[in-house]
Amino acid sequence: MTAIQLIVGLGNPGAEYEQTRHNAGAFFVERIAAAQRVNLVPERKFFGLTGRFTHQGQDVRLLIPTTYMNRSGQAVAALAGFYRIPVESILVAHDELDLPPGVAKLKVGGGHGGHNGLRDIIAQLGNQNTFHRLRLGIGHPGDASKVSGFVLGRAPRAEQEKLDASIDFALGVLPDIFAGEWNRAMKNLHSQKA
């Protein structure tokens, strides 16, 4: 299994969206940066906040696009192209309507499932969809017409605590992910629920 060289956290920029459900992926990357004592700095050529740390001799880059969600691929393609990071070495963390709060799941490849950030990443990577995903459950409002307001809204405290717990679970399996032990990482992560 290819080593992960880039971890992307999806979200929308600006104070208006900072604490919204749609920014779950960005929360995950912020937590990694804090744990690794990495300062995320704006990089105009990568359209986002970036940082880097070394894990067992391997550079791992962090990216939070500062484009809007539906343009996330611009940032991912720019950074991955510049550093020649293969699509299979990218992990994208994002909010997932189809999972309840408190649940996180890993996935390799697949479609965008209606997620505009994933849709743009796949398009900007030349229709390659073999990157890894960390799906952070935010739940579903129950009515498709309410999805936009739901993902762009703040979660109630109990829901946010469950999302935070699922991020903790995901951080706990990062050593397995870095070691390429995807089956073990999936088994451990998928058995936990806040």
Curated annotation (Swiss-Prot):
GO terms for biological process: protein quality control for misfolded or incompletely synthesized proteins; rescue of stalled ribosome. One of its GO terms (molecular function) is peptidyl-tRNA hydrolase activity. The active site is at H22. Keywords: Cytoplasm, Hydrolase, RNA-binding, tRNA-binding. Its EC number is 3.1.1.29. It is an enzyme of class 3 (hydrolase). PROSITE patterns: PEPT_TRNA_HYDROL_1, PEPT_TRNA_HYDROL_2. TRNA binds at Y17, Y68, N70, N116. Monomer. HAMAP family: Pept_tRNA_hydro_bact (MF_00083). Belongs to the PTH family. This is Peptidyl-tRNA hydrolase.
